[in-house]
Amino acid sequence: SNSKVPKMKVLITGGGGFIGARLARVLIDRGFLTGVAGDEEPIDEVLLFDSVDAPELFGKKEGGIAIRRTIGDISDRETVRGLIDRDDISVFHLASVVSGGGEKDFDLAMRVNLDGGRYLLEELRAHHGSQRMVFTSSIAVFGGAGMPSRVGDTVKQTPLTTYGVTKAILELLINDYTRKEFLDGRSARLPTVIIRPGKP
């Protein structure tokens, strides 16, 4: 194999949830990410980060990939700094206070959804390698009424909830960090997701 191809660390925030665990399974089974030029970048570490403990679904190592789990608070800057500990890293940012929770606790939604996301972006920016971020946004950025059946990048964002506002802001920040070439960022707007039982 080509020794110049960087081995990638994959960080999944919200890694204890349904989507995070499913994503981890797919990536571990596949064993590589696909780079910008279409080249395979082997994964050597997957870190599942979440605010709560989750069922143990993975071994400590599978197919040469080290699998680690960390519990912590994404709105703590030092915690985030510890997660972004190398240059060649791809972050799948799924961690979020959900819509109902954001309406009940504005400050929590701002801390987790906005500050946590911004800390990830800033820590990625501080590195100089192949830093990528895929952010799970939401159709909540469009609000509800009057949304067209087909939504392109030019449709105006009119969020009606704190959750939708935090998602829209982070999308804009990711676009700007990418424009400035601090990292390579993408946002994927998911439809309504069935959340895990219990907290959070």
Briefly describe each language-model feature range.
Residues F32-P55:
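Conserved glycine-rich Rossmann-like NAD(P)H-binding loop of the short-chain dehydrogenase/reductase
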Residues G59, G101-L108, G144-P148:
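Conserved catalytic-core motifs of eukaryotic protein kinase domains, centered on the activation segment
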Residues I89, D107, R111-R118, Q131, ...:
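Conserved internal alpha-helix in NAD(P)-dependent oxidoreductase domains
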Residues T13, F49, V91-V97, M133-I139, ...:
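SDR active-site strand-loop-helix element
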Residues G144-M147, L160-T192:
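Active-site Tyr-X1-5-Lys
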Residues K9-L33:
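N-terminal Rossmann NAD(P)H-binding glycine-rich loop of SDR-like oxidoreductase domains
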Residues R118-T162:
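Conserved Rossmann-fold NAD(P)-dependent oxidoreductase catalytic core, especially the SDR/UDP-sugar
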Residues G64, I71-V112:
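NAD(P)H-binding glycine-rich loop region in Rossmannoid oxidoreductase-like domains
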